Amino acid sequence: MNFRYTIQLLLTILTLLCFSCKKETPGNAGILQLASCTIGSDQLKYPDNTSGIINDGNIIIIFSSAVDTNSAKKNIHIILTDNSVVSARFSFSEDLTTVTMDPDSPFGNNTNYKLSITTSLKGIKGENFAGIEFTFTTANAAFVIKNITINNQNFAPPVKGKNIALNDLNISIEFSASLDTTNIKSHFLLAGNPVFNTEITSDGSIIKLNYTGLLAGYTNYNFAISSNLKARDGFTFSGFANSFFTKLDSTLKFPLISDDELLTLVQRQTFKYFYDFAHPASGMARERNSSGDIVTTGGSGFGVMAMVVGMERGFITRTHGISHLNKMITFLETCDRFHGAWPHWLNGNTGKVVPFGTKDNGGDLVETAYMIQGLIAMRQYLNPGLSSEQDLIDRINVLCNTVEWDWYTRGGQNVLYWHWSPTYAWDMNFRIEGYNETLITYILAASSPTHTIPASAYHQGFARNGGIVNGKSFYGYALPVGYDYGGPLFFAHYSFLGLDPRNLTDTYASYWIQNVNHSLINWKHCVKNPFKYVNYNASCWGLTASDLSTGYGVSEPTNDRGVIAPTAAVSSLPYTPEQSMNAIRYFYYIVGDRVWGQYGFYDAYDVGRNWWATSTLAIDQGPQICMIENYRTGLLWNLFMSAPEVQSGLTKLGFTY
């Protein structure tokens, strides 16, 4: 403890004792006592130093009785270590017991001060004061960003920059103190390590960063300021990080061609997935471009229809197509089947089931339906006048007629079940109910000449006794059946690669209106863009099941993740020709440098997460080539609908077509 403060404290105590013990008499002034002294929320301590005092607070001094205001102004001082006095304005409470000192300028940062109240201070009645001196130290200033903008947009987190120009990046940062300019450029960090041009204002508190190099379009860039940055007076900085999205690079990535040529190109490139990339031993379609020997039943059914398109358009010769089909049929005849149904996945070499899940190691009736849809369309395309093709027709008929659709009613219930396993039997317990992508399953089951199901299974099982009816409008488009907003767009594709919806109606819906409006709702949702995803627009749309940055999942208006899957808009071409054609142009010409690959459009992308898939999936590639063909010529629709058993099945279920 400071010796001088010790002596002063003892004298103050002795004085207080003397006055408190002495009986007052007329003409004997009393004692003025100090009740408290605060700066901001901090109580000044005595005799200890009080640290961490805010630099813009008032000093509030409370006495036991009223003070003489003139005496207070002369005898209460804020003093620096060099004994200079800090000027301040005084104000007093109505009863004159409280003195408020408001310094003319804020206290310095990390600075020592004294608050001196001398013995000459008097109360309003002449009371004496023993005198006291407090010491305090102000807090070190926070060196912080006061304001930051990027291309004139607020850039303070959580706000992120959007649609930032590709060739003129400007970041302006105002700090709370002047900058130490030593190696100043090294403290401002951007992916790719570009060198900023810098401009600092005369007071050193504002820095302007400019980069005129070319940034990549539709890219999430991380910008950071190092915590090694310092203020001129030595104060440290805690660091800064934020990100921004660049605007779309709208330059054409490929030369312009006619729309007809573009559609042919998309079909030709996508066809390669089912022919060039087909499993060499089985001819089947691999689940995805990284699946090795795993082949998929449903995706291969789409591939059979793609083979029709490939032969018809001359992507391969008919001889090569027939040879490939023979390989596939041979595999389908000898691979694992479960009461006639194929499993979801198979090993393309051995033909053995590859479990899709723990208990999903048996028949998958929906995947089987997609295969049968493709085989029937192919059968109708083959020429019975050629012995080699008649042989394939006969073998296709055997495959179709040995699917035990009725077995999958699980003992004659009025519903179909999705799975059956020789190990787990019906443990999956998944009823095939609508409205979704499984409509074709009921139509083919009703069409079977050998293992048919009753119409009641369709109406009670799939249609749920009318439970599939919706009837509401979304974004101005009426939806006859299904979930609100329609669900993912693959509902409008998988069953309708062969099944022609143009004139298809039953007691529940017009399926042309259903699919058109479902597609328009999906498109309009992306145009409205309620979640403000950076890449959505009238030409960039399409929510369906696809790969995601985190795995695989379903996107739809009610579960919008910001992920665009080209297959959604491309495969809706028959339903929304204008909107889908705009999307095809956009995917190819504008973002084709990122979404166009060896087998057509990659599966999906998410600009907001800076994620662009390089994967292709059979169930997403197949609908594109097939639905483009249905838009152009109606080929697959016409073939499938020409099958007599299909017509019988539709009539049985109460459809008109």
Residue ranges of predicted features:
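Bacterial N-terminal signal peptides that target proteins for export
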Residues: 1-10
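Basic side chains
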Residues: 4, 22-23, 313
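Hydrophobic alpha-helical segments, principally membrane-spanning helices and signal/leader peptides
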Residues: 7-8, 49, 103, 255, ...
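C-terminal motif of bacterial Sec signal peptides marking the signal peptidase cleavage site
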Residues: 17-20
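Short, flexible, glycine/charge-rich loop motifs used to bind or transfer phosphoryl groups or to couple energy/partner
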Residues: 23, 49-50, 161, 293, ...
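Acidic, low-complexity Ser/Thr/Gly/Pro-rich repeat segments typical of extracellular/periplasmic
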Residues: 24-251
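Ser/Thr/Asn(+Pro)-rich, low-complexity disordered segments
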Residues: 250-657
